[in-house]
């Protein structure tokens, strides 16, 4: 009953033109009410086609624009009606139009809305393409099914993107944490260097202070004695001048001669411009070296030793460690027993299993506690040739060796090409190594044709760098423990 009354009221406040609830209702003197926009549009049409005649769209009674009045009473009814819901039963009827109460049987293609027949005739949907729901339901069902499959694919892509970004986030965190650790370690090394340099400088200054002040104290004592002696002479002369004639003349020539011949001794002094000038450590150079070492360490490769049949060396099971046997090896050739300690250096040379034909490669070798070793890169050698007695002279770049070495525990050297007078003898150049390395880093840049050696023990300082290397064929890591039985160890990248 109540819903019927509401429907009747709704009909009374519905615009006859747009068939919607009145919006800003205006009433003509004939009593009919219209939306302000609808009656204005109707007025414009009347002016265009009927030569200025204005008439009510419902009853066709003429009207004048000044007779149009806002209908606030109807506006209030419309406002209240919009707030009022129909009965619960009617509200649950989703197949009926909420505006007109008619069955929702049509589909408006332009607005993608289900509408009733009154909606179809309204201003909102006028001129639109409308269809029975049954005509388009199957078509849109297929489209929605296709869209659903597309969404499921998008969901998989989205989940993969989500997983990828999480993985990247975790990777970045690990990398940054690793970089933080490296930064802390690098600056700790810098602090160690600065502390050591500071301690050395202070010790030098204390020694300098002790030596100089000790010498100046001795000079000061002599100067005090000399001053006292002069004062005593002055006192003696003053006494003679004030005394009797006999006291004045007694031994006067000797005193005058002694004064005339007296020469003041000057103290031993130290010229300040001769002092050793203190220079702060080259922090920029240190940082540059740290950066260089950090860069090359990004090219760290996991090097292992190649298997071999050399009886004079022992390779560990993990193929990372090599050591020499007792060098007093006896060789038997054609029934003759002879000792070849010279050839032993080359007989203990071992190649890494990884060949280098391009790119950048870095590895580190632990040589702690060894008194002799040779390491670097080699362009490969024939095992049979190692027994050639002349090969102990072929550690030269032109023969495919870019190596440095240690002998007698303190003598570091680099093997360079020999002169034209001694082409088969390498030119052995001593290296200045302040801190003996327990670990040596080797960096090969194949395209740049360089081989660099770093003292990892001394904060990554560069030991030596070969430039313009002639890499005409693959090169290999090279280790030679020489006659020292202490092992050499290839370090893993994680060490």
Curated annotation (Swiss-Prot):
One of its GO terms (cellular component) is P-body. Residues 283-495 form the B30.2/SPRY domain. Zn(2+) binds at residues 97, 100, 119, 125. It is found in: Cytoplasm; Nucleus. Pathway: Protein modification; protein ubiquitination. SMART domains: BBOX (SM00336), RING (SM00184), SPRY (SM00449). The modification N-acetylalanine is found at residue 2. SUPFAM superfamilies: B-box zinc-binding domain, Concanavalin A-like lectins/glucanases, RING/U-box. Keywords: Acetylation, Antiviral defense, Autophagy, Coiled coil, Cytoplasm, Immunity, Innate immunity, Metal-binding, Nucleus, Phosphoprotein, Transferase, Ubl conjugation, Ubl conjugation pathway, Zinc, Zinc-finger. It is an enzyme of class 2 (transferase). Capsid-specific restriction factor that prevents infection from non-host-adapted retroviruses. Blocks viral replication early in the life cycle, after viral entry but before reverse transcription. In addition to acting as a capsid-specific restriction factor, also acts as a pattern recognition receptor that activates innate immune signaling in response to the retroviral capsid lattice. Belongs to the TRIM/RBCC family. This is Tripartite motif-containing protein 5. It comes from Macaca nemestrina. The lineage of its organism: Eukaryota, Metazoa, Chordata, Craniata, Vertebrata.
């Amino acid at each position: 009953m109540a819903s019927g009354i509401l429907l009747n009221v709704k009909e009374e406040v519905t615009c006859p033109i747009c068939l919607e609830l009145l919006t800003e209702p205006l009433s003509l003197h004939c009593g009919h009410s219209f939306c302000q926009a609808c009656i204005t549009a109707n007025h414009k049409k009347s002016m265009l086609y009927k030569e200025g005649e204005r008439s009510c769209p419902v009853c066709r009674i003429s009207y004048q624009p000044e007779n149009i009045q806002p209908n606030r009473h109807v506006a209030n009814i419309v406002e209240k009606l919009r707030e009022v819901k129909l009965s619960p039963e009617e509200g649950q009827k989703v197949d009926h139009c909420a505006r007109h109460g008619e069955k929702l049987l049509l589909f408006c293609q332009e607005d993608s809305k289900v509408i009733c027949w009154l909606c179809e005739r309204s201003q909102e949907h006028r001129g639109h393409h409308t269809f029975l729901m049954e005509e388009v339901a199957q078509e849109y069902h297929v489209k929605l099914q296709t869209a659903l499959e597309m969404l499921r694919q998008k969901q998989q892509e989205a989940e993969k993107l989500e997983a990828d970004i999480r993985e990247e986030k975790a990777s970045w965190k690990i990398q940054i944490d690793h970089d933080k650790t490296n930064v802390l370690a690098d600056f700790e090394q810098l602090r160690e260097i600065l502390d050591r340099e500071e301690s050395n400088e202070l010790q030098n200054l204390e020694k300098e202070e002790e030596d100089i002040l000790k010498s100046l104290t001795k000079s000061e004592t002599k100067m005090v004695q000399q001053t006292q002696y002069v004062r005593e002479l002055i006192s003696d002369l003053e006494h003679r001048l004030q005394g009797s004639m006999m006291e004045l003349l007694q031994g006067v020539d000797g005193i005058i001669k002694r004064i005339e011949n007296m020469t003041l001794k000057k103290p031993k002094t130290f010229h300040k411009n001769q002092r050793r000038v203190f220079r702060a450590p080259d922090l920029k150079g240190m940082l540059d070296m740290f950066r260089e070492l950090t860069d090359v360490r990004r090219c760290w490769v996991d090097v292992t030793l190649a298997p071999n049949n050399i009886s004079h060396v022992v390779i560990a099971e993990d193929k990372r460690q090599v050591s020499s046997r007792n060098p007093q090896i006896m060789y038997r050739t054609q029934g003759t027993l002879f000792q070849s300690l010279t050839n032993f250096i080359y007989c203990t040379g071992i190649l890494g299993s990884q060949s280098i034909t391009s790119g950048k490669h870095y590895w580190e070798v632990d040589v702690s506690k060894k008194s002799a070793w040779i390491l670097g890169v080699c362009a490969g050698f024939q095992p049979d040739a190692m027994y050639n007695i002349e090969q102990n002279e072929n550690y030269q770049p032109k023969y495919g060796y870019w190596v440095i070495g240690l002998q007698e525990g303190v003598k570091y050297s680099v093997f360079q090409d020999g002169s034209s007078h001694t082409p088969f003898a390498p030119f052995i150049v001593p290296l200045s190594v302040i801190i003996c390395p327990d670990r040596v880093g080797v960096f090969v840049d194949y395209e740049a044709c360089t081989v660099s050696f770093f003292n990892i023990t001394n904060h990554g300082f560069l030991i030596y760098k070969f430039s313009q290397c002639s890499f005409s064929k693959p090169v290999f890591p090279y280790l030679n423990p020489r006659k020292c039985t202490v092992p050499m160890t290839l370090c893993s990248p994680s060490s």
